[in-house]
């Protein structure tokens, strides 16, 4: 099958002025799964969308609801899958895809030693402006650091919403990070109110 991917937020081809552009992890996981099935995966070009036979399936991901969307009504694809917080906060990847890591070849600007992922999902807080509790629920374990740091990638960008709220699981993962000698970017920051002496000691070694 021929698979077309669309990053509605328009980030897959942009990197200028030294800005950090993060890969769309969900589309990366979808790409890896289809590649494992022997399918051909590529970024969909706008002109190709008018040919309904060009792709067997199109996946469109929209992270932000303020991103300018695409009017898919002008296209007549039988298999169009739309996902991401910008479309539906409750739609999730199938389990067998969600457990995979992104196909990093899809994002040529990502350094060969970088990996992206989350150790936890959810958050115990209910900030009125945040979609996370509605989308992911209460804080819980999600992945092990060794699942994320694949292919010799030693610089891991963790996009957890509130990792320190995960208690013993967070401490276990921090110790693993230390033991593995990984460099970590806690990309979504941390809740300073949760930093205990034990956490401080672990974080000081990361």
Predicted feature descriptions by range:
Residues 6, 44, 61, 83-85, ...:
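A cross-family glycoside hydrolase active-site/sugar-binding cleft signature
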Residues 1-79, 88:
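A short, structured N-terminal alpha-helical element that caps or precedes a catalytic domain
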Residues 4-23, 105-136, 153-160, 164:
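N-terminal pre-triad scaffold of radical SAM enzymes
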Residues 49-56, 74-77, 110-111, 148-153, ...:
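Flexible, charged surface loops at secondary-structure boundaries
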Residues 95-96, 107, 114, 124, ...:
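Ankyrin repeat (ANK) tandem alpha-helical domains that serve as protein-protein interaction scaffolds
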Residues 149-206:
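Conserved SAM/AdoMet-binding glycine-rich loop
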Residues 57, 79, 114-116, 155-157, ...:
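Structural preference for beta-strand elements that scaffold enzyme active sites
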Residues 79-107:
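Ser/Thr/Gly-rich flexible loops in soluble cytosolic domains mediating phosphotransfer, phosphorylation
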